Amino acid sequence: MNMRIIEAVDIRYTYPDGTEALRGINFHAERGEVVALLGPNGAGKSTLFLHFNGILQPTSGKIMIDGEELDYSKSGLIKARQKVGIVFQNPDDQLFAPRVDEDVAFGPLNMGLSEDEVEERVRDALQKVGMLGYESKPPHHFSGGEKKRVAIAGIIAMKPDIMVLDEPTSGLDPRGASQILRLLHNLNEEGMTIIISTHDVDLAPLYSDRIYIISDGEIISTGAPSEVFSDIDTIRGANLRLPRIAHLVEILQKEDDLPFEEPYPLTIGEARRKLRNQLR
């Protein structure tokens, strides 16, 4: 079995106005991984994601899904979008129906499923996102976090192998962000491959198996979180920063002469273990 469930191979994309947004991107996610694409605003994160199920077609290069090149015919795009679901940064760009259940049912209905199967999928999806009981309500009156959960439910109902989320916690308060991240963790535990874009350097190491750094349309670093954040010059050169915990340890080492070894801790748990070792 091919472990690379989705792959971008030398993807280049130029917008009609001549803006070169992607410059030879190579990216992959393995089956069951959580992968974060980390970069500042305008780096090309959203543009790359729109290639993953054929919303955009590359100027050159190819997208591979389950070992097969993405086919841009009507039937090929339907097949790709059943395997790869995309959740936009702004849920208002995704929600359009007057009722929650109608919105969540849109994808399954267009897959040609029976009414009973659609109803079951809608109920299951809403239960997973904690929105069961909201079926008849208008989603456009919801909070940002509730809208995001309905948008995710619409993707869950299609049962894709891969869920791609553009800035999933953007604009949410801490509680709303925590609910979304817990939901994504649960979906991943059930076997779904999760790909997120973010510029939140504190979030990425907490939830990701691997990280890609994108800057000016190019991948400039990839690896496990500890590997990526150990290259401090690359992180700062991409107009990003170290996670707060790592930055604190960097200051303690350089300005207070505390003997921390690199790589710096990226989470509170890692920092606690290192501090306990220092105090023994």
Swiss-Prot record:
Binding site for ATP: 39-46
EC code: 7.-.-.-
GO cellular component: ATP-binding cassette (ABC) transporter complex
SUPFAM superfamilies listed in its UniProt record: P-loop containing nucleoside triphosphate hydrolases (SSF52540)
Broad class of enzyme this protein falls into: translocase
GO MF annotation, one: ATPase-coupled transmembrane transporter activity
Keywords for this protein: ATP-binding, Cell membrane, Membrane, Nucleotide-binding, Translocase, Transport
GO biological process, one term: cobalt ion transport
Annotated InterPro entries: AAA+_ATPase, ABC_transporter-like_ATP-bd, ABC_transporter-like_CS, ABC_transpr_CbiO/EcfA_su, Co_trans_ATP-bd, ECF_ABC_transporter_ATP-bd, P-loop_NTPase
Protein's cellular compartments: Cell membrane
Keyword Translocase: yes
Residues of the ABC transporter domain: 6-241
Membrane topology: Peripheral membrane protein
Record function comment: Probably part of an ABC transporter complex. Responsible for energy coupling to the transport system.
Family: Belongs to the ABC transporter superfamily.
Family annotation (NCBIfam families): cbiO
Protein name: Putative ABC transporter ATP-binding protein MTH_133
UniProt source species: Methanothermobacter thermautotrophicus (strain ATCC 29096 / DSM 1053 / JCM 10044 / NBRC 100330 / Delta H) (Methanobacterium thermoautotrophicum)
